[in-house]
Amino acid sequence: MKQVKDAMSALNAMVGPTHTLRQASEKMIQHKTGAAVVMDHDLPGPCVITERDLLKALAAGMDVDAEMVGDHMTGSLITAAPEWPLQTAADQMVRHGIRHVLVFEGPELVGILSMRDVIRVGGLAADARADAA
């Protein structure tokens, strides 16, 4: 059975809350990801800014060169552990209507898992068939 660690991505796209939305989008494009992790010593924990957050700001006519990530990021996150079954993490994503979860090993942030990662490694349907056999 595949685990979260088999599909998760490294923490490449990282920004701070004072980065602009344009800077966040450039970082996400550079790393070919749909989300950037937001880190800052003043935050209680890591947050995320996603493609959806950027699209909402654009649709509202906001200036991506003036708007700060901190005003658009998501702070209440669903998290996973590297050893979780991939199916469990995917189920949580569907249940909560999200496409990204942060992966923690104990207190340490070790990666990010996206629905794109789940699809990339595939095998969920194959895992379900194997479990049923």
List each model region and its residues.
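Tandem CBS (Bateman) regulatory domains
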Residues: 1-11, 46-79, 85-94, 109, ...
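Conserved SAM-binding loop
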Residues: 14, 102, 111
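The conserved cystathionine-beta-synthase
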Residues: 15-32, 38-39, 80-97, 104, ...
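Local beta-strand N-terminus motif with an aromatic residue
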Residues: 33, 45-46
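Conserved beta-strand segments that form the floor/walls of ligand-binding pockets within enzyme
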Residues: 37, 102, 114
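Acidic/polar N-terminal loop/beta-strand segments that form early-domain functional surfaces
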Residues: 39-41, 51-52
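Glycine-biased flexible loop/turn sites that connect beta-strands or occur in inter-domain linkers
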Residues: 42-43, 107
